A protein has these predicted regions:
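Noncatalytic alpha-helical scaffold of FAD-dependent oxidoreductases
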Residues: 1-222
């Protein structure tokens, strides 16, 4: 479907779509979970999915992006954590409670440093409002940023994030990580100055290495 959509009509034309209408969930809750390392957050994601605990949404941001987003949108994210995860469940009250408790237990097994569950729908929406403001918030970190887009197996999240950190040091360029953790879709944001030719050159090389590594671990360019 992604290939067909991305081809913009070149590979074919969709003439009919059948959709299934779902009931509005009885209960929707989200949680903010802090971690001491981004690798811990990646391992937590892989374990949550492996144990059959399927969330309605699951996103991760690193410390640099969390701080920028807090400054930009006053989202109230944990500022002392190296990585932060937003995880959301919907369904019946019983199912949501069971899933949230299971996710909390898995997070604790992966060294979570904090966990805050939404107490109202407005608080839940506030959690997500910060994530949606993440990209514009990058304006406080650098004059420009280049967004990479790659998908990897969820079990490889911790490994790939560790490699991105290594490459950041290699190229001496800051990187802010945001990604759709539930499906392994990464968006590393490389901070640079487009008016500096050397900075732009290093950024392009850095980005290419990230995407090559995504493919190396069994992922794809998206």
């Amino acid at each position: 479907l992604g290939l067909m959509t991305g081809s913009e009509g070149l590979l074919g034309v969709i003439t009919e779509v059948t959709v299934k209408i779902l009931k509005t969930p009885e209960v929707v809750k989200a949680a903010l979970v802090g971690f001491p390392t981004i690798e811990d957050a990646g391992k937590c994601v892989a374990q949550i999915i492996a144990e059959g605990c399927i969330p309605a949404g699951m996103e991760i941001m690193d410390k640099a992006l969390t701080k920028a987003t807090n400054d930009y949108s006053k989202a109230g994210y944990p500022t002392d954590a190296e990585a932060m995860m937003i995880i959301e469940f919907d369904g019946t009250e019983h199912d949501v409670e069971a899933d949230m408790n299971k996710a909390k237990k898995i997070a604790e097994e992966n060294n979570s440093s904090s966990l805050k569950i939404s107490k109202s729908n407005s608080e839940r929406l506030k959690f997500w409002a910060g994530r949606k403001a993440a990209f514009p918030a990058c304006g406080v970190l650098a004059p420009d940023y280049m967004c990479m887009d790659g998908s990897i197996p969820r079990g490889k999240l911790a490994e790939v994030l560790k490699e991105i950190s290594r490459l950041s040091k290699k190229y001496d360029l800051p990187v802010a990580n945001a990604f759709h953790a539930g499906d392994g879709n990464l968006h590393p944001l490389i901070m640079f100055d487009a008016n500096n030719e050397e900075s732009l050159k290093k950024t392009e090389e850095f980005g290419a290495e990230i995407l090559k590594y995504c493919v190396k671990v069994g992922g794809a360019l998206t």
